């Protein structure tokens, strides 16, 4: 349940999380106590995203970590008895590195990847518009996580998708900033003001929170199926720095320190090599590692790029032979696919092997389209509902014109989600054959079945 909390003004400048006052979250904050003594930390992660890291239509999901292991180790060195971290506030900022009113928009998910079901995992869902140059959402997750939890880096995950982002390769069109205010503690944190609610909205600018129904998902959909194949962007650490933000009037209350970690996409060093379906890019170890970060799988320091060919190789080898090479984002494994999907994949493997050739790649642009049609993105599809293409489905069901008074889409009937209702108007069930075809399209991509696309595409 999303609850609007204290209203605040989004900070001007380049650090939105700095505008979140710790006194709005914790009751024991006072001018006479330093934030460092209270173990309160502000961090910001800046990612420059290239078109290569965004699927053909601009639909690309990227899992973004929010806490470096080096930060945790520094806290443990200072106080060995520390056991938990409390997520006090989170800011998501998507900045356009191009002219205003260019018609670029998108969606953002904030979720806890440790959950099994979609409705329990989802923290925030919002649609953003970059016509004004930037979009920001500030929220309070308001829950603690054990520092020993192997899913610590997955407890807050951010996935971003873009629409109508028609940039040439080797340019940086988007900057994504993820800021967080967290507090480390030993055994029990009793000073949290809001003790009964998690995930309440603090402020939004050019971002409209949406109900789960707007994305065509159901409460019992499996997160392992919906997000297991989120393709992560390999990043390179550029630099880290520490900002000092004045507190109080004229800085009379001291300065707030905000650590900033800046990253760039590892794709920028790949030259003009363009990823093609069925041909994974070979990335050096330096491009796959972000120093200071640790994924859920301890053997992988940072997630690499998940390609469709990896999935196809897994299908050829079989589930029992996938091995460690199938590890993808944040410790996920291809072994987690459902038995239903695996059955469909195996049945259609022969048809795929005898299918049509790969489409040509245009100069300066990646092409995954069907001639004469608007390009559809096969990189990720909703596998929890029948007859659903994520690219077209999100465009169809995320209409901000159908928002209620609290900016949540209103639906007739169904359960209440975030103050709004969702019903049958969102998900349109279709026949089994349509479902089979969409499973095939998800697994192998429409270029393998260019003349056998479902009518909805």
Curated annotation (Swiss-Prot):
InterPro entries associated with the record: Trichovirus_mp, Viral_movement
Protein family membership: Belongs to the tobamoviruses movement protein family.
Superkingdom to which the source organism belongs: Viruses
Biased composition (Gly residues): 411-426
Record keywords: Host-virus interaction, Inhibition of host innate immune response by virus, Suppressor of RNA silencing, Transport, Viral immunoevasion, Viral movement protein
Disordered: region residues: 265-284, 293-312, 345-457
Biased composition (Basic and acidic residues): 448-457
Known role: Suppressor of viral-induced RNA silencing.
GO biological process: proteolysis; symbiont-mediated suppression of host innate immune response; transport of virus in host, cell to cell
Single GO term (MF): serine-type endopeptidase activity
Name of the protein described by the UniProt record: Putative movement protein
């Amino acid at each position: 349940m999303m609850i609007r909390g204290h209203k605040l003004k989004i900070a001007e400048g380049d650090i939105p999380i700095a505008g979140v006052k710790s006194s709005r979250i914790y009751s024991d904050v006072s001018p006479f106590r330093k934030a460092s003594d209270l173990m309160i930390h502000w961090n910001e992660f800046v990612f420059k995203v290239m078109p290569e890291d965004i699927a053909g239509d601009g639909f690309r999901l990227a899992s973004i970590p929010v806490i470096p292991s080096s930060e945790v180790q520094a806290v443990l060195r200072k106080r060995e008895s520390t056991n938990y971290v409390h997520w006090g506030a989170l800011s998501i900022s998507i900045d356009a590195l191009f002219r205003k009113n260019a018609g670029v928009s998108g969606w953002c998910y904030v979720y806890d990847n440790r959950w099994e079901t979609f409705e329990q995992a989802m923290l925030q869902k919002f649609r953003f518009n970059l016509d004004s140059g930037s979009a920001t959402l500030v929220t309070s997750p308001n829950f603690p996580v054990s520092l020993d939890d192997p899913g610590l880096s997955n407890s807050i995950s951010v996935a971003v998708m873009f629409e109508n982002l028609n940039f040439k390769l080797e340019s940086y069109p988007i900057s994504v900033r993820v800021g967080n205010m967290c507090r480390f503690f030993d055994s029990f944190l009793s000073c949290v003001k809001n003790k009964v609610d998690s995930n309440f909205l603090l402020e939004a600018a050019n971002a409209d929170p949406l109900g789960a129904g707007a994305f065509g998902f159901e409460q019992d959909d499996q997160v392992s199926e919906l997000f297991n194949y989120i393709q992560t962007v390999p990043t390179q650490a550029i630099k880290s720095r520490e900002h000092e933000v004045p507190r109080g009037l004229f800085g009379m209350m001291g300065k707030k320190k905000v650590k900033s970690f800046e990253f760039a996409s590892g794709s920028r060093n790949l030259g003009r090599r363009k990823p093609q379906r069925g041909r994974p890019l070979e990335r050096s170890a330096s491009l796959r590692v972000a120093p200071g970060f640790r994924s859920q799988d301890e053997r992988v320091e940072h997630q690499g790029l998940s390609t469709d060919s990896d999935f196809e190789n897994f299908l050829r080898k079989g589930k029992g032979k996938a091995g460690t090479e199938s590890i993808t984002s944040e410790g996920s494994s291809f072994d987690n696919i459902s038995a239903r999907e695996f059955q469909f994949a195996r049945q259609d493997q022969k048809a795929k092997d005898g299918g049509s050739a790969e489409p040509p790649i245009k100069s300066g642009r990646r092409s995954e389209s069907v001639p004469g049609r608007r390009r559809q993105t096969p990189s990720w599809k909703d596998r929890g509902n029948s007859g659903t293409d994520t690219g077209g489905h999100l465009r169809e069901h995320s209409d901000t014109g159908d928002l209620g008074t609290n900016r949540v889409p209103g639906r007739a009937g169904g359960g209440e989600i975030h103050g709004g209702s969702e019903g049958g108007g969102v998900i349109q069930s279709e026949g089994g054959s349509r479902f089979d075809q969409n499973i095939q399209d998800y697994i192998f991509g429409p270029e393998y079945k260019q003349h056998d696309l479902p009518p909805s595409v």
